Each structure stands twice: as C-alpha cells, then as structure tokens.
C-alpha cells in the first residue's frame, strides 16, 4: 500500500507546529472505526442522468434497451423533479438534476439551465415524430451510414449526446470545481471552526466540511463499485455515462497519469480536512480544478477532430454523432476552472462557438480547426 504525505506548519501561541498530512491508499476515512464518507446523493443524480440519456434516445430509462417514447412533460419531470423514472429508487429522493446544473456557488449561471430544457423540448417536438423518416438538411429524422444510425433534429444534432455531454460540465464538473471544493461551500458559516473542533453534522459521523468534499468526490466516482476502498487511479471501471467515463478515456489516450493526479488530490485534500490543514486542502482543490477541466478540453478537441475525419471518410451519421458529442463538451467549457476560479472559456465565448456549430449540415471545417487551436492553446493540452 502506498501513501502520500505533506508536512505543513500551523501557527500556535507558543511556536510553529509541524503537522503531517497523510493520504491513505484509498478514499477510506474512518472515525472510531466507522466510515465518514458519504456521497449517495451524487450516485442518485448520476443514475438519474443515465435515465434521461436513455429517454432522449427513445429507450426505456431503466437501461433495458427497449424502445419507449416519452413526452416532454415526462422527461422534464426526470430532469427538474427527479420523478417518473422507471427505477423506483431514483424517484422521490429529493435529488434533482436541474437545480444542480450551472449552480456552483462560485460561478452559478441559472440561465444555462434553459439550454437543457430547450434540448428536451426539441427532441420531443421534432425528433420523435420523425423517428422512422429519413433525415436531411433542415429535416429531422434517421441518418444512416456504413457505421451507425442516429436520430437527429433538423440541424443534425443528436440530442441525447448534446444533452449528456453538456451535463458533464454543467452538473458534474461545475458541482466539483465551482461548488463543493470552493471556500463558499467548504468554509461557509461555521464550517471551518466546526471542522477544526471536530463538531459533527447533526446525527452524522462526519463534519460538514468533510461531507462537502465527499460530495465533490461523488460527482466523479459515484458510480464506481466500492469507490471508497478501491485504488481509483487504476480501477477505471464504471457503468455511467458522465465525467468518470471520459476521465478513463483520457487516461488511456491523451494524458496517461491524469487519473492518479486527480485521485491523489482527492485523497490528500480529504486527509488535509481531517488534519485541519486548510492550505493543503486548497492546494489539492486547485489541482482538481485544472486536471478535471482538462478532461473537457481534451474531449472537445477529440470530437471536433473526429468529426472532420469521419466526414472525410464519407460517414455522415458517424460524423454528426461525433460533432454532437463535441457540441456538448463545448457547452461544458464554460464550467471549467483554470485554478484561479475563472473558466478557460466564458459563457459568451462558448455561445459564440456554439453559434458556429448550430447547423451541422453547413458547418465550416475552418471554424472547427480554429476552435481546436483555441482550446489547445488556452488549456495547454
């Protein structure tokens, strides 16, 4: 078993005390032999996101693969209210996705929530009625090539992809880097003093600050089996469709070692909270902001380049599938964090890029190449 440790100086009335912060091999933290880690709410929301992803492909939201057509009201209820989902365990929990989308305490922008609402409405009003029709420029329907078939709106957007990839940034990343690891959550009210003095949340075995960090952890690892006792720098297996899935892809391609950097930062940051070493906590938070944001940058580039490659091969459906994913990841760029609590791309910059991607049938490769260059340059990837 491997451990990482830092020594930090803490002020006292008499002298400087050296505090050792040791990160365990896994994310297992105990108090009197009982786990202090809890992120069940995040697991619920990630599972709800998977259900909506299925519904936006006219598949039963339980993941069975059966064809099922939903009304706008039904999908809206899943998104806004956490209700109407076939898996009863995901209903009536009080956990809702929409209210956690673009809602970070450091950078909330509730106007972005309407973009997700609009995608749901577009899917039901335009894509579903044309499910078996042939798609063409300006005409929604089914688009098929030698590699796949997809269902698109009149602009060529595959909405299950634009929605879920946008949610990766709008909920998962935003809740981590712009909310739970931020001082506006960590140190809100009396949380810092309570944590220092070992005052636990009412009826719980953890402090409020410990729990906030764990909630951030859950938005990345919440669908991994045995996440608290597994080496998450090497065990990269999960059933979900959100941020962790794409971290594993980047680990295996663009940036080997990124999974370890992120897992180590989560562990050491949590250990620092237990030790009351808040400078160490904040240093690990900055690592998480930058490294997790890179996942969004890498995948934005990958899918833009993938579109151009697939189009040159004559596979329009496959290309539009890739560009739909790219569209969603570009939506997600506004939720990145450069370590100084600024996004790598502002909402205005993102909206300008999305405008150039509004019609896949007429998209310009020179615009995509320019976007790729901007993302690589700004994010140093």
Question: Could you describe each region identified by the protein language model?
Answer:
Residues 16-381:
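Mature extracytoplasmic or organellar-lumen-exposed domains after removal of signal/transit peptides
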Residues 11-14:
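Bacterial signal peptide processing site
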Residues 5-9:
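C-terminal motif of bacterial Sec signal peptides marking the signal peptidase cleavage site
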């Amino acid at each position: 078993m491997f451990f990482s440790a830092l020594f930090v100086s803490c002020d006292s009335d008499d002298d400087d005390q050296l505090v050792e912060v040791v990160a365990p091999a896994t994310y297992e933290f105990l108090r009197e032999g009982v786990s202090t880690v809890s992120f069940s709410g995040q697991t619920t929301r990630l599972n709800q996101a998977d259900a909506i992803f299925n519904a936006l492909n006219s598949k039963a939201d339980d993941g069975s693969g059966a064809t099922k057509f939903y009304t706008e009201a039904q999908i809206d209820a899943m998104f806004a209210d956490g209700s109407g989902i076939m898996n009863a365990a995901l209903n009536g929990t009080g956990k809702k996705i929409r209210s956690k989308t673009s809602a970070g305490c450091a950078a909330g922008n509730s106007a972005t929530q309407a973009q997700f609402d609009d995608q749901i409405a577009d899917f039901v009003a335009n894509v579903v009625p044309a499910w078996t029709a042939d798609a063409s420029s300006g005409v929604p329907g089914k688009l098929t090539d030698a590699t796949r078939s997809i269902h698109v709106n009149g602009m060529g957007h595959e909405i299950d992809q634009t929605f879920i990839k946008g949610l990766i940034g709008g909920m998962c990343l935003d809740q981590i880097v712009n909310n739970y690891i931020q001082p506006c959550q960590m140190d809100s009210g009396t949380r810092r003093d309570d944590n220092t003095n070992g005052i636990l949340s009412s009826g719980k075995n953890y402090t409020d600050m410990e729990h906030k960090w764990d909630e951030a952890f859950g938005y990345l690892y919440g669908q991994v089996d045995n996440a608290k006792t597994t080496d998450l720098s090497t065990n990269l297996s999960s059933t979900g469709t959100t941020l962790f899935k794409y971290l594993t892809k980047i680990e295996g391609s663009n940036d080997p070692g990124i999974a370890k950097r992120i897992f180590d930062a989560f562990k050491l940051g949590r250990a620092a909270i237990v030790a009351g070493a808040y400078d160490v906590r904040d240093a690990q938070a900055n690592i998480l902001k930058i490294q997790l944001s890179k996942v969004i940058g890498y995948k934005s580039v990958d899918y833009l380049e993938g579109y151009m490659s697939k189009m040159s091969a004559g596979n329009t459906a496959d290309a539009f599938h890739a560009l739909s994913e790219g569209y969603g990841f570009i939506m997600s760029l506004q939720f990145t964090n450069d370590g100084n609590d600024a996004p790598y791309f502002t909402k205005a910059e993102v909206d300008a890029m999305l405008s150039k991607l509004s019609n896949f049938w007429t998209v310009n490769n020179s615009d995509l190449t320019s976007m790729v260059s901007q993302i690589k340059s700004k994010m140093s990837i």
